[in-house]
Amino acid sequence: MEDLMTSYSFTEKKRIRKDFGKQRSILEVPFLLAIQVDSYREFLQENVDPAKRTDHGLHAALKSVFPIASYSGNAALEYVGYKLGEPVFDERECRQRGMSYGAPLRVTVRLVIYDRESSTKAIKYVKEQEVYLGEIPLMTENGTFIVNGTERVIVSQLHRSPGVFFDHDRGKTHSSGKLLYSARIIPYRGSWLDFEFDPKDALFTRIDRRRKLPVSILLRALGYSNEEMLAEFFEINTFHINPDEGVQLELVPERLRGETLGFDLADGDKVIVEAGKRITARHIKQLEASGIAALAVPDDYIVGRILSHDVVDASTGELLAQANDEITDEQLQAFRKAGVDAVGTLWVNDLDRGPYLSNTLRIDPTKTQLEALVEIYRMMRPGEPPTKDAAQNLFHNLFFTFERYDLSAVGRMKFNRRVGRKETTGEAVLYDSKYFGERNDEESKRLVAAHGDSSDILDVIKVLTEIRNGRGVVDDIDHLGNRRVRSVGEMAENVFRVGLVRVERAVKERLSMAESEGLTPQELINAKPVAAAIKEFFGSSQLSQFMDQNNPLSEVTHKRRVSALGPGGLTRERAGFEVRDVHPTHYGRVCTIETPEGPNIGLINSLAVYARTNQYGFLETPYRKVVDGKVYDEVEFLSAIEENEYVIAQANALTDAKGTLTEQFVPCRFQGESLLKPPAEVHFMDVSPMQTVSIAAALVPFLEHDDANRALMGANMQRQAVPTLRAQKPLVGTGIERAVARDSGVTVNARRGGEIVQIDAARIVVKVNEEEIVGATDAGVDIYNLVKYTRSNQNTCINQRPLVQVGDVIARGDVLADGPSTDIGELALGQNMLIAFMPWNGYNFEDSILLSERVVEEDRYTTIHIEELTCVARDTKLGPEEISADIPNVSEQALNRLDESGVVYIGAEVRAGDIMVGKVTPKGESQLTPEEKLLRAIFGEKASDVKDSSLRVPPGMDGTVIDVQVFTRDGIEKDKRARQIEESEIKRVKKDFDDQFRILEAAIYMRLRSQIVGKVVNGGAGLKKGDVITDAFLDGLKKADWFALRMKDEDASEAIERAQKQIQAHEKEFERRFADKRGKITAGDDLAPGVLKMVKVFLAVKRRIQPGDKMAGRHGNKGVVSNVVPVEDMPYMASGETVDIVLNPLGVPSRMNIGQILEVHLGWAAKGLGRKIQAMMEAQAAVADLRKFLDDIYNHDDTNVANRVDLSQFSDEELLRLARNLTDGVPMATPVFDGATEAEIKRMLELADLPSSGQTQLYDGRTGEAFDRHTTVGYMHYLKLNHLVDDKMHARSTGPYSLVTQQPLGGKAQFGGQRFGEMEVWALEAYGAAYTLQEMLTVKSDDVQGRNQMYKNIVDGEHEMVAGMPESFNVLVKEIRSLAINMELEDN
């Protein structure tokens, strides 16, 4: 028993979830961002000793491209190693300045120049040098990249694994519906090679999907003759020709199966098969038993059979017949005449030995290897004149050289497995013993020595003909054994290699010059192509996405996403149903629930909770070992290919206390089917019930009671929840909340254990435990700076709040501070609301939601959004734009929020249309009248030559300015505001460093004190020899004088010396860091070309919940707020408590998401238990009673050993703190597929003194009358989604117009109008509202003259309109004229 008890950390002791899971946890939830972090770590191999780096990532890419030799071969550039420098700016600075977070890559290369004169290639001279190859983006510890100041995520790609695949066309190609089989060799990079049958059973090949050629052309190009091809693919029957008549067949009985002979088959006198009868398996057994070796057959038996070899007249050398000819009567007579003794024929039949290659040879026009090579050249390069060399080089470069073709380790492994070879390693190119055997370069000799007489291409064709012959099966391309995951590291490596290959071409050109001109490696290598390739990938690849940062869950999910789209993947339009569908191999690897609705459904998936990738990139999932019906805790990860061979039981299979499977038949999965098997046949068992789903789906309680479509919506909508002002843990969770919050990186976790010594809103200081301190310079202090009110990618607010107090003792990994949407280290996306399921005056018709005013008053769903507004001053043709408070034609009142530099104050409350940054732009001189010129000469009025282009608050937005940043171009004088900001920033940094130094110093002195108090001195600091140091003496001594003490004890004097060194080292380090920071702050900023100054203003916008906002539960039960009703009108219970939200009960039955009802029941029980605990606390019950009640809640069910809570670990003080944290409700965990049962929910309700039906009598708040029947009431975790009505409301009177049609633009972003479409026109036509219609189609839309005239008329007070010609009609006329049809308008 005891070993099951977990010890609780400091954070967990604050609040413990009651867990209903029956399954003991075998495997902890793994680090959720591992797929990103591990992949990129392997790519960089940053902290690995250069000599020990493996063939991955940067190292592999550099090794594959270098050495680069010049065309003459007299100079070469070799790769030695690489190292990454330090990033110039840290993550925070990059975000602020809009930079990319990366480190410079420096590669050491060696230029070797050989002596031309010597025959042995003697080295003339060698130069080694470090070359800068651009910036490599670095990954933050949360798995993201910062590109141009924004956080991005590189999504992993699920693509078809390299290797060989066999398939058929499902009868679609030919009208007869005949299945045409095909094979395709897909390399990691290089040309695809296809083999396919046509309806006439000839075999063709295609290279890169071009036009098809008979497959024999490819084999002939490899060097095979007709006879060799036939010998490879067919077994041969030998016939001996009798001189007069008849033929003797060398009998292999098996080969006669299915034939019908025209003569009796006899063994002596005993007839085995009568003439005209079909030969069966029984007959063959008899023949084998009889031991007949030869069979005499008539001539007509051999006629029509296909020759396997050329037949030559031995005496004259005349060719009598060629291989692959069908034997005719005449030829047979000629053989007899020439005295040919024996001929070989191909063993073919219609059943399972098709004559496919023989058919193909008949349509092959080529005769020699050269002709075949030329044919391939013509197909690949139509229109170019072929030469022998060109044809040979082209063919060689297609499949046989590593520069152009790479199967990769995965591809080779898959290839060898599919064609039935034992070994999984081999060459990256296609190997063919005949082809390489005829070449005599070094590489070919090495290959032949290594692989002997195998042939990749022949093996594929053999497997394909076997499949066509009915032996073997085609592959399922949606099987996860045939699709692999390409993660960040691998994609970055490919991009880096592409950049290097571009560099290689340029280097080759220059190397020939290097010999004569003595160039250095730095002059040879131009890093631009590499840097450009990397920048393009991280900045604009389809898989480099703007991180979804609504809340911690959406961040984690985005990083765990697996997409089938992207370069080298599928496209939405072409992806069929099969690719998108759930496949049995998805089990435990890819979530079967979470995928977007819409055009991407099934193409974008999410990794399952426990899934990981193996070394080849295939997804694997963990299973527990089962041996002879006994389940062990040993865990093994299986890929989809390996899993195929095993029988796997479900996680909830019944076992006894010893772990033996108890049922007679266990429900299992085997090869994609579900069946029942006896325990002895089971090999593995699932690790956990939530193995099949992703994190988002695993966060939905009672998922097992929801319909899959709704569960999908629930999982997707949790990612859109906006972090509320105060996060609230879900009363009903699934127990995985803590893991998600921990791995998302939004909380602050302790790096090392220790004691909290100082804390404020922005910083936590930990004095580290002695045993965790490493190294002499480590002062044993950890300082955590918290993130305060910063903007996320989705404009939500990121803010961290400390959870600990001074004096708390914490361990490594404890949560020190909560981030957005976390509550004591648990994910908390919404609020627990009291919900009633009942109709309420139609206000909850069609999923509408009725809210109580109390929800708004208590700010339960108030969220803070941070908007970033940017004002840019550019250099224009007419002169520079200027940021200033001196703006023409603007009232004083409009400028009252600006300082003298023209920038808004921090703390100003602004509304739509207010000026935030004053800016004027010079405008072109208009022609002035002499009077104006005179006036301007007299009054010197300058206002007329600039126009106001200030940054104003956009419509529909109001808020408080929380931060202003001013960026100034290098070499331009900073204005007063910029200098102010700079000074305050330097002050802040200085104070920060001073504080940090003070804390470190105090910690060092404190450690020193413990090491020297009570020790004897030799003198110094006013002490005599033999005195003992006391605490009181040290208190009276200046800190600097401590180091003057001379100790008797060796250790103590060493401690003093060490402390002094530490303080000096830290002081130096802080000075250096401060100087570095200061330099960065005061330096000019790197702005885009033409930009002189940039001001960023950050607005905090408070959004309360209001009608029109979208809300949802976790079960796909979404809706829009329809009304906010005063508290006194809401339904209330007998106790007087009013409900917060009223939902429509009709939303449940048809949608089949019953999970929400169970959640409401259990939530109510959780809240009731909290109230009982509160009542006990208020009554000051004895701690023992409280302990007993908590034990009753957590450990009532003795059978559920898996999740007992050991309350004996808690001291009385800790228990009281736990109880205080539970007064708001006892949080419950019901893990997916292993959740609370109906009986358990009822027991909890009873324990909380609530009706076990989960229903209660409600009263109408307006009349006070009781409703007719009892209502389901309880607590549900309800979310506010990031679809807020404030972001969608939009109106326009005048605004921008489209350039060509002159019609108003559309959409809020463009400040567009509302489209008056076809159907709306019909509606006005139907009403006969001709004038309204004319106005809509002309002056309100695209009649330019009419628009302007209308404007003038309104200004003049005349309300009349003159409709003219709509511009779009003019466009139509012009388009018709462009088709050379003249169309003119006549006045009627």
Swiss-Prot record:
InterPro entries in the cross-refs: DNA-dir_RNA_pol_bsu_external_1 (IPR019462), DNA-dir_RNA_pol_su2 (IPR015712), DNA-dir_RNAP_su2_dom (IPR007120), DNA-dir_RNAP_su2_hyb_sf (IPR037033), RNA_pol_bsu_bac (IPR010243), RNA_pol_bsu_CS (IPR007121), RNA_pol_bsu_protrusion (IPR007644), RNA_pol_Rpb2_2 (IPR007642)
Q: Which GO terms describe its biological process?
A: DNA-templated transcription
Q: Which UniProt keywords apply?
A: DNA-directed RNA polymerase, Nucleotidyltransferase, Transcription, Transferase
Broadest EC class? transferase
> Does the keyword field hold Nucleotidyltransferase?
yes
EC number(s) in its UniProt entry?
Answer: 2.7.7.6
A cellular component annotation (GO) from this entry: DNA-directed RNA polymerase complex
Presence of keyword Nucleotidyltransferase: yes
Catalyses which reaction? RNA(n) + a ribonucleoside 5'-triphosphate = RNA(n+1) + diphosphate
Q: One MF term in GO for this entry?
A: DNA-directed RNA polymerase activity
Relate the assembly described in the record. Answer: The RNAP catalytic core consists of 2 alpha, 1 beta, 1 beta' and 1 omega subunit. When a sigma factor is associated with the core the holoenzyme is formed, which can initiate transcription.
UniProt record similarity statement:
Belongs to the RNA polymerase beta chain family.
PANTHER family given in the database record = DNA-DIRECTED RNA POLYMERASE I SUBUNIT 2
Function (record text):
DNA-dependent RNA polymerase catalyzes the transcription of DNA into RNA using the four ribonucleoside triphosphates as substrates.
Report the NCBIfam families cross-referenced here: PRK00405.1, rpoB
Protein name, entry field: DNA-directed RNA polymerase subunit beta
